[in-house]
Amino acid sequence: MSEPGVVLVHGGHHDARCWDPTVEELARRAPGLRAVAVDLPGRGRRPGDLMSYSVEGCAEAIVEQADAAGLDEVVLVGHSASGMVLPAAAERLGAERVRRMVFVAASVPPEGGTILDTLGGPWRPVAARAARRPGPISPPPKIFAAATFCNGMSREQRRFALDRLVPETPLLSVLPVSRAGLPPEIPMTWVLTLRDRSLRPGAQRASMERLGGVDDVVEIDTCHDAMISEPARLAEILLARVGRQVGLG
């Protein structure tokens, strides 16, 4: 069996660059492993209209970038709000290509529901107001983003994260999703961020229950943006799911 590649999908107000520290760790620990961080439509290098956003368009973007990288079998990794689009990408790729799905501090709506249906804490009123906006949403104020995404980061990590926040579609929290076509045989891992202020552990466990089929839960004592705060630990987790036995160091 050939070694799968790793496809990394960002969440809201982020783009592919947020994965750079983890991609670097993967390359250092496992030379030759193919890993690609994708941009969803309207972010980074991927053209698109943030006001014409759809789950289907995101899934198509993920598949196209995986194909462009020459990846056949893959481990799909999604952070935060990409929990709503990762199953659609897996459905398009099919069980014959998706070795495993990994959800990192993700938000998974109820079947047929929206992310707004799941939100509590500081994000619900923000998302509800944002959904009524006539244009893209500016990145959150840095003081707010630092508190919700970056608590516990070093100064350098926090600067890296905040400098790479991007505008977001107001549709993100109100798009209904369906996982009816997700192949049930694809195994799923959940990376649970214990100090997460954006999606607290209880909210993540509720998302796990809505998703169903999670057979592997790994806890990290870190904040929401684990790919920046704990890239070495996250790389180790991903390599174990790929099948590479590479330890820390």
Whereabouts are the PLM-identified features?
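Conserved HGGG/HGGXW glycine-rich cap/lid loop of the alpha/beta-hydrolase fold
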Residues: 2-47
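The conserved beta1-alpha1 loop
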Residues: 7-11, 79, 192
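Active-site loop/oxyanion-hole signature of alpha/beta-hydrolase fold enzymes
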Residues: 34, 40-75, 89-92, 116-120
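Gly/Ala-rich beta-loop-alpha elbow adjacent to hydrolase catalytic centers
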Residues: 77-82, 86
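Flexible "cap/lid" loop of the alpha/beta hydrolase fold
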Residues: 91-92, 96-135, 141, 172-173, ...
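Active-site nucleophile elbow and catalytic-triad environment of alpha/beta-hydrolase enzymes
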Residues: 163-181, 186
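Conserved loop-alpha-helix segment in the C-terminal half of the alpha/beta-hydrolase fold
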Residues: 194-221, 228, 240-242
